[in-house]
């Protein structure tokens, strides 16, 4: 049973993973619009009939402040500051807002709620996935297996591919648009794409 979890609640905070500055929050309307796009893209790969879609707002919106505090008490500040992006921002004199530190905890709690056996994510999500393992152990569950994938660099060859960075190739774009964008990629970047997307090195 595959579970596609839509983070409609923490999206209003903004995922701080890999960010050097605080990410602007999204409105509820933007979150729902994005969720529709995510599911459309996901079902290009996943079997719709064998996939359950869940929204974590279903449990987070029911939490009392007392329950939130109890959940926070399970994670230390030292653990949070060991996270590379938070650590880099603190050392660089940049702000890390308290609400951003909620994101890994919420993602970790998702694993408890859906009783995840395996969680898939990019390498930038490893910290959050490990928080989930710890919380599952505390709840008497078998901790999930973490499967992380390399991040795909964007067309700028610098940052990860992201719509918010404008350096992406959309999976639902017209073929002509995809082709044009890929043709703009450097040879060095194409070598990386071959390795990450096809699992093989490009023949020269």
Label each region the model flagged.
Residues 1-15, 118-126, 132:
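N-terminal catalytic cores of NTP/NDP-binding nucleotidyl/phosphoryl-transfer enzymes
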Residues 5, 27-34, 170-174:
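Short acidic-hydrophobic sequence patches enriched in Asp/Glu that either
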Residues 9, 109-112, 150-152, 165:
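Anionic group-transfer/hydrolysis microenvironments
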Residues 11-14, 60-65, 128, 153-156:
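Short, well-ordered, mixed-charge alpha-helical segments that flank or form enzyme active sites
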Residues 13, 26, 86, 90, ...:
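Short clusters of hydrophobic/aromatic residues that line enzyme substrate/ligand-binding pockets
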